[in-house]
UniProtKB/Swiss-Prot annotation:
The keyword Zinc does not apply. The gene is hisC. It comes from Haloquadratum walsbyi (strain DSM 16790 / HBSQ001). Keywords: Amino-acid biosynthesis, Aminotransferase, Histidine biosynthesis, Pyridoxal phosphate, Transferase. This is Histidinol-phosphate aminotransferase. InterPro entries: Aminotrans_II_pyridoxalP_BS, Aminotransferase_I/II_large, HisP_aminotrans, HistidinolP_aminotransfase, PyrdxlP-dep_Trfase, PyrdxlP-dep_Trfase_major, PyrdxlP-dep_Trfase_small.
Length: 376
């Protein structure tokens, strides 16, 4: 007995956790700064923590009312009807829901390269195929509707990540509008706004009242600090919102996650503090790191360092965990998440020193001189 052929499916590889790295280095986890997974360094709202505790004694019952209450609150926040909110276990779950609703065998999904690895995974799970459009370093990762439309070939689903991961670049509302008007009426444009709270641009959610070929993804994992609870949603046009009842997983958004998210929405001061910190940190990285960086609308910065793996490994040895972006096709770069002000300042000092050390070691090795880090 064997499953179907899964050879085309690449497994999702998450960033390593602090405890895992601490065991490897044989150090106290509290001595490490994790800046590799774009998490909220301030954690969840205290109100969300209280809601989690309050829910503990009732997890023996299904989350029907919690699900309904959160859906209604999100809808009210955006000025939509509750039917237009597809609650899901993280934004990943919403990606799968849209694949279930729109993909039939042989359909194609158009996604950015580089981009989030779960888009192609979801397409293949649902017997679809993938085509890509470039978001290239040579063009400073700029996203333009005209460039996307050049690669467009009547795909059923078209994903745009704004702010883009790992570059942080954005596609403004006028460009999204141009995209919506430039594709076939049977193509759904999915705007992934996982990092939308950190952006200075308005959300594309306002467009779904005008265009029935746009859906928008949002998550509570980032600015709301609830990554461990896996709660997100898609905002969809009213004309086909009723499809949710036919494709969603029953009670997929658990009660604890729903109650925590409901409390987190009400504590906007915590969200605003988290956003303010991230915006300060990303500018601090760009101003203080002695390496090329790009403007970012997210809670992270992409940094060109020459040898991303070597820099990430050396930074880890010094207690700062960052993301080597080789898996994104950018082996010369690292992605650095925004920490607290204290964490960010410490990270800048360590990463700057590490970049210099790696560059020196590489230059020395290439010149044929024996060093501690390598031989000719």
């Amino acid at each position: 007995m064997q499953p179907r052929d899964l050879s085309a499916h690449e497994p999702y590889v998450p960033g390593r956790g602090t405890k895992e790295v601490a065991r490897e280095l044989e150090v106290d986890p509290d001595s490490l700064i994790k800046l590799s997974s774009n998490e909220n360094p301030h954690g969840p709202s205290p109100a969300a923590v209280d809601a989690i505790a309050d829910t503990a004694e009732t997890v023996n019952t299904y989350p029907k009312s919690s699900h309904t209450d959160l859906t209604a609150r999100i809808a009210d926040y955006w000025g939509l009807s509750p039917e237009q909110i597809w609650l899901s276990p993280g934004a990943d779950g919403a990606i799968d829901y849209l694949s279930r609703a729109f993909l039939t065998p042989g359909d194609t999904m158009l996604i950015s390269d580089p981009g989030f690895s779960y888009y192609p995974m979801s397409a293949r799970y649902h017997h679809g195929s993938i085509r890509t459009y470039p978001v290239s370093k040579e063009q400073d990762f700029q996203q333009r509707a005209s460039d996307i439309l050049t690669q467009y070939d009547d795909e059923r689903l078209l994903y745009v990540t704004t702010p883009h991961n790992p570059s942080g670049s954005e596609l403004p509302i006028p460009e999204i509008t141009a995209l919506a008007e430039g594709v076939d009426d049977q193509t759904l444009i999915v705007i992934d706004e996982a990092y939308g709270e950190y952006s200075n641009n308005p959300s594309a959610i306002k467009l779904i009242q005008e265009y029935d070929n746009i859906a928008v993804l949002r998550t509570f994992s980032k600015a709301y600090g609830l990554a461990g609870l896996r709660i997100g949603y898609a905002a969809v046009p009213e004309s086909w919102a009723d499809a949710y009842a036919r494709i969603n997983t029953p009670f997929a958004a658990n009660k604890t996650a729903c109650q925590a998210a409901l409390a987190a929405i009400e504590d906007q001061s915590h969200v605003e503090h988290s956003i303010e910190t991230a915006r300060w940190a990303r500018e601090h990285y760009r101003e203080e790191l002695d390496a090329r960086t790009w403007p970012s609308g997210g809670n992270f910065v992409l940094c060109e360092v020459g040898d991303g793996n070597a820099v990430a490994e050396a930074a880890k040895q010094e207690g700062v965990i960052i993301r080597d972006t080789t898996s994104f096709g950018l082996p010369e770069c690292v992605r650095i998440s925004c920490g607290t002000r204290e964490q960010t300042k410490r990270a800048v000092d360590i990463i700057s020193a590490v970049i210099e050390d790696v560059e020196t070691a590489t230059t020395t090795t290439e010149s044929g001189v024996e060093t501690e880090v390598g031989r000719p």
